[in-house]
């Protein structure tokens, strides 16, 4: 089924039907109450935003599984680091993505391929960075 509508600028567009409400609720629940978290861009370099985020998850003993993803690290804060999301091989509820904007679209595609339904992106360089950033932001929609 396809619905036709006008967007805010008045141009006609095609919208897909809304997803099943129960799937939306599951996605939100996974974001707010994750059993497992992957941190894309994890690092142990002091002062780095991803390091502080990761350090807090470890320090305050997040009860679920923690999976750091960084293609150039073997271990981060005592946990095995994975080069790619797909290498984890376990179900993950939430991805926290702390990487440069140009890598975010590919990372979100990896999340989708791995069955991760919720993600939080902490990055800069999208619409606020000009034309190239606007194109990146459009790619995420």
Please tell me what each predicted stretch does.
Residues 2-141:
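Catalytic-core regions of core metabolic enzymes
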């Amino acid at each position: 089924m396809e619905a036709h509508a006008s967007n805010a600028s008045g141009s006609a567009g095609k919208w897909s039907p809304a997803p099943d409400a129960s799937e939306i609720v599951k996605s939100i629940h996974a974001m707010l109450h994750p059993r497992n978290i992957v941190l894309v861009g994890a690092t142990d370099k002091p002062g780095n935003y991803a390091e502080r985020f990761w350090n807090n998850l470890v320090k305050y003993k997040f009860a679920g599984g923690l999976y750091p993803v960084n293609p150039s690290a073997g271990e981060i804060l005592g946990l095995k680091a994975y080069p790619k999301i797909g290498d984890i091989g376990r179900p993950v509820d939430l991805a926290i993505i702390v990487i440069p904007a140009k890598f975010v679209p590919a990372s979100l595609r990896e999340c989708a391929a791995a069955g991760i339904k919720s993600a939080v992106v902490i990055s800069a360089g999208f619409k606020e960075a000009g034309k190239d950033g606007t194109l990146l932001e459009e790619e995420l929609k």
